[in-house]
């Protein structure tokens, strides 16, 4: 009536025989192969049922067995499958259905667990063998190799194709004049202006001889010979295209060589035939001091003509200049870059009829951006001029230290340029009438440098002397110190000292320059201390001496400083005060190396030696005849000097 209850205690399970089924793993097995086997799910155990449903066959992979045992057991796998049976307490195939169902469920669970476990153990077995192989290989490498420090891995030699090599950038920058037509001149090229009487208008020739000179300077001779006849001829044939026949002009000439007159004469000659005043000449200068000088030159050359010459300076009211330019258009407009940009922005002037663009002191103009003036001017050319073809404007670039940098000159878009320069391999030239002196001061006596300056001024005795210092602060300090030494009776001569500095008003600085230009009184030495502000283009007559109290920072700066004297073939002297061996070596390597001097001109000499020769007889009885007499200071002078310094410090 009731089904028999299943008693689990009566179930007797015979432990099945474990028959591992392994694959042979080669010694050089790689991890990728083992991973692939695992991914493919290597079938280690299989579960099968016979028709009676009571026999279940299971195979397991067991660690620890040898490969020979595995092979023998795998061969008898089929025979042992039938022997692996579960004895259900002696029950036969006629047992109850509930007991059979329960038994089948238990067998299925055991089969799944066995399969998963066998795969896990298989994976561990493969990993152990791979790790053993890697350790063995690593050990062999360590035994064979020698331990050494970290070193750079040897690299193969770089194979370079010389055809593809790019030139050094520094070399490319200094090739501005490679494709430029060159005209060389020398100091012997001088003529009488009377020889150009056929090429110059009578008024212009008369003004030249009246206000300037009856003979030319070398750079003037070179330019007038090259362009005067060409200008006159092309103006008669085609006024529109004469600029292309001339081309652009680059001039590298020493200071005081007559550059201003060299470009002013051809310009005035060209405009002498004009009938209506239109802006045809634009002259750009770096400072307002140069503006006054160029304006004076142009006005003197144009005397007796109807040419309108206008200047524009920052000190003038912009609104007044704007109204004046709109009312009367000038023939020649002289200005600075900053004010020029202002007028172009406000349409005060038009460049439609422009024929000449002059850059005086061009190296300074190109080195400084000045409100990005070059792109502004070039852009205005394109918008104003009807003739957009290259060469519609003659660009005239003048400087004593003309740059050779292609990057700077490229913005000017030069057309068929011609370079005028002396036949020298060096960058800059000095006037042949300039005598240079090297004044060497020992480093141990550098504190006496102001006293040596005063001693040098005593030897110069009279005339105008320009003293260059490094900064505005140095100018102020040196002025106070020199005046204190003079008041302290460190000299018996009459020396007047002034300085150009930012503490003075503009009007005060102009007054000082004006007073300095006047003739000195007899037995009086006028000294003007200044920075490099006055080293460019300022033409003050009869400056006898230039003293470089502070060494200039470049050969370019040195040329401009020395150019304030020995102008217009007059004699001049430059004194370089060099402290210690360092400054002397710097002057030799960085300044003197770039400077060319005329073969028949003056050469630098030691002032210490020349002083000893002059004053040697006075000190013939000294116990040290070979000592430097100029730098020798007695104890009384030293004490007096130190006392003055002490008093200045306390103030």
Curated annotation (Swiss-Prot):
Gene3D superfamilies membership: P-loop containing nucleotide triphosphate hydrolases
Pfam family, one: DEAD
Comp. bias regions, Polar residues: 49-60
Region span, Disordered: 1-114
Ranges of biased composition (kind: Acidic residues): 27-42, 69-85
Top-level EC class as recorded in UniProt: hydrolase
Major location category of this protein: nucleus
PANTHER family: RNA HELICASE
Motif mapping: DEAD box: 360-363
Function: ATP-binding RNA helicase involved in the biogenesis of 60S ribosomal subunits and is required for the normal formation of 25S and 5.8S rRNAs.
UniProt keyword annotations, A-Z: ATP-binding, Helicase, Hydrolase, Nucleotide-binding, Nucleus, Ribosome biogenesis, RNA-binding, rRNA processing
SUPFAM superfamilies membership: P-loop containing nucleoside triphosphate hydrolases
Any one GO molecular-function label of the UniProt entry: ATP hydrolysis activity
Domain Helicase ATP-binding: 240-420
The protein's Enzyme Commission number: 3.6.4.13
Compositionally skewed regions (Basic and acidic residues) per UniProt: 7-17, 100-113
UniProt cross-references to CDD domains, sorted A to Z: DEADc_DDX51 (cd17956), SF2_C_DEAD (cd18787)
Membership in a protein family: Belongs to the DEAD box helicase family. DDX51/DBP6 subfamily.
Assembly behavior: Associated with pre-ribosomal particles.
Residue ranges constituting the Helicase C-terminal domain according to the UniProt record: 452-611
Keyword Cell wall biogenesis/degradation: no
Subcellular location per the Swiss-Prot or TrEMBL entry: Nucleus, Nucleolus
Protein's name in the database: ATP-dependent RNA helicase DBP6
